[in-house]
């Protein structure tokens, strides 16, 4: 009996698993209400640096005269905090004097104009991408004096705050306690009942720091806004906490977000807001002499939010002169079609010329008002 040879079995091969292709979607990054594009390469023409000192601001108790608001006090030491009735420096006031209140300092920078800034598709704007800031301070020893052989020093509540943005800083109006109302002169106090403003709610007022009249005890930065802004603040409490201030010119603060985009100067302006308190001594608030800023700008391309039609209407199609003209004018519609003319204007045209040889636009003069021939020519 012969054996049939076994057929070789085919080796089963599993199909190779194909790596799924990841579909890349177009990323659209918006900031400040515009679509942000690539940055312009750095060069001498596309980079800009500015340095400035911002002075501290203390309120002014002078009332408004002739409709003019009082100017702020650029002091580093406030007036003495005391009670108006007893003169004691212990009782806390519900309406303190304005010259004992620290307000936000405000500065505005206008970068230079960019040549060939706008094209049909995009436009170039200045972008703040890094900065350096520090306080101008000195130790206070002999300047504070001594009592009973003990040298005084600064202590108490401290505040360190700065903000840079393409628009003024957005703030919310709050009160430290349910009885605090703020100064009666100079400062802009949050409208509303202090009993409801000492805790955030849906009726909390909002504003923008457009002047140096906003107190640091009544207005706080709004974390739900300030999209095109970067701010930093630190509050140190305690009745006897001494200030610890570090300063130097070897630290750089990057201002780029998670998409690598800095502060866009879409309106051609950069707004700087700051407020600092070192503590109190002899019932007076002490602040630094100034805060120093060194700002570095570069150019960034953004998508042009204006179409040519909008630019034409806003720039070219705007009357240069304002006139007081008649409003009851009768409008007459003329059509450029060959047809019989009304009898009232037949005598004004030459009879020896063919109507087809006339120009497309003809000025007709008549002793009587012209009639609308649009419906008759159809």
From Swiss-Prot:
<dbReference type="InterPro" id="IPR011222">
    <property type="entry name" value="dsDNA_vir_gr_I_capsid"/>
</dbReference>
<dbReference type="GO" id="GO:0075509">
    <property type="term" value="P:endocytosis involved in viral entry into host cell"/>
</dbReference>
<feature type="region of interest" description="Disordered">
    <location>
        <begin position="1"/>
        <end position="21"/>
    </location>
</feature>
<dbReference type="Pfam" id="PF00718">
    <property type="entry name" value="Polyoma_coat"/>
</dbReference>
<keyword id="KW-0167">Capsid protein</keyword>
<keyword id="KW-1162">Viral penetration into host cytoplasm</keyword>
<keyword id="KW-1145">T=7 icosahedral capsid protein</keyword>
<keyword id="KW-0426">Late protein</keyword>
<comment type="similarity">
    <text>Belongs to the polyomaviruses coat protein VP1 family.</text>
</comment>
<dbReference type="GO" id="GO:0019062">
    <property type="term" value="P:virion attachment to host cell"/>
</dbReference>
<keyword id="KW-1048">Host nucleus</keyword>
<protein>
    <recommendedName>
        <fullName>Major capsid protein VP1</fullName>
    </recommendedName>
</protein>
<dbReference type="GO" id="GO:0039620">
    <property type="term" value="C:T=7 icosahedral viral capsid"/>
</dbReference>
<dbReference type="InterPro" id="IPR036931">
    <property type="entry name" value="Polyomavir_VP1_sf"/>
</dbReference>
<keyword id="KW-0945">Host-virus interaction</keyword>
<keyword id="KW-1164">Virus endocytosis by host</keyword>
<keyword id="KW-1160">Virus entry into host cell</keyword>
<dbReference type="GO" id="GO:0005198">
    <property type="term" value="F:structural molecule activity"/>
</dbReference>
<comment type="subunit">
    <text>Homomultimer. The virus capsid is composed of 72 icosahedral units, each one composed of five disulfide-linked copies of VP1. Interacts with minor capsid proteins VP2 and VP3.</text>
</comment>
<keyword id="KW-1161">Viral attachment to host cell</keyword>
<dbReference type="GO" id="GO:0042025">
    <property type="term" value="C:host cell nucleus"/>
</dbReference>
<comment type="function">
    <text>Forms an icosahedral capsid with a T=7 symmetry and a 40 nm diameter. The capsid is composed of 72 pentamers linked to each other by disulfide bonds and associated with VP2 or VP3 proteins. Interacts with sialic acids on the cell surface to provide virion attachment to target cell. Once attached, the virion is internalized by endocytosis and traffics to the endoplasmic reticulum. Inside the endoplasmic reticulum, the protein folding machinery isomerizes VP1 interpentamer disulfide bonds, thereby triggering initial uncoating.</text>
</comment>
<dbReference type="InterPro" id="IPR000662">
    <property type="entry name" value="Capsid_VP1_Polyomavir"/>
</dbReference>
<keyword id="KW-0946">Virion</keyword>
<keyword id="KW-1015">Disulfide bond</keyword>
């Amino acid at each position: 009996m012969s054996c049939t040879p076994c057929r070789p079995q085919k080796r089963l091969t599993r199909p190779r698993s194909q790596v799924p292709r990841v579909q890349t979607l177009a990323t659209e990054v918006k900031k400040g209400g515009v679509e942000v594009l690539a940055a312009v390469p750095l060069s001498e023409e596309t980079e800009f640096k500015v340095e400035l000192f911002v002075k501290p601001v203390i309120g002014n108790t002078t009332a408004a005269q002739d409709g003019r608001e009082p100017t702020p006090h650029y002091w580093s030491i406030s007036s003495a905090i005391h009670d108006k009735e007893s003169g004691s420096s212990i009782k806390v006031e519900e309406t303190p004097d304005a010259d004992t209140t620290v307000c936000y300092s405000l500065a505005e920078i206008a970068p230079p104009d960019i040549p060939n800034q706008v094209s049909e598709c995009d436009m170039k704007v200045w972008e703040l991408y890094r900065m350096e800031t520090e306080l101008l301070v000195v130790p206070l020893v002999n300047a504070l004096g001594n009592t009973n052989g003990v040298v005084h020093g600064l202590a108490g509540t401290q505040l360190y705050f700065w903000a840079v943005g393409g628009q003024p800083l957005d703030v919310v109006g709050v009160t430290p306690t349910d009885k605090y109302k703020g100064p009666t002169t100079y400062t802009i106090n949050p409208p509303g009942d202090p009993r409801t403003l000492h805790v955030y709610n849906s009726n909390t007022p909002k504003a923008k720091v457009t002047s140096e009249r906003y107190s640091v005890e009544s207005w706080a930065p709004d974390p739900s806004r300030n999209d095109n802004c970067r701010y930093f603040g630190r509050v140190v409490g305690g009745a006897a906490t001494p200030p610890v201030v570090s300063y130097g010119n070897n630290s750089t603060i990057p201002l780029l977000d998670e998409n690598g985009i800095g502060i866009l100067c879409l309106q051609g302006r950069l707004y700087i807001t700051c407020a600092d308190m070192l503590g109190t001594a002899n019932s007076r608030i002490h602040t630094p002499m100034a805060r120093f800023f060194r700002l570095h700008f570069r150019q960034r391309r953004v998508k042009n939010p204006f179409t040519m039609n909008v630019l034409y209407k806003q720039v070219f199609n705007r009357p240069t002169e304002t006139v007081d003209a008649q409003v009851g004018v009768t409008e007459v519609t003329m059509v450029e079609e060959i047809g019989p003319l009304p009898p009232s204007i037949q005598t004004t045209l030459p009879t020896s010329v063919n109507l087809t040889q006339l120009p497309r636009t003809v000025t007709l003069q008549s002793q009587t008002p012209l009639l609308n021939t649009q419906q008759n020519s159809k």
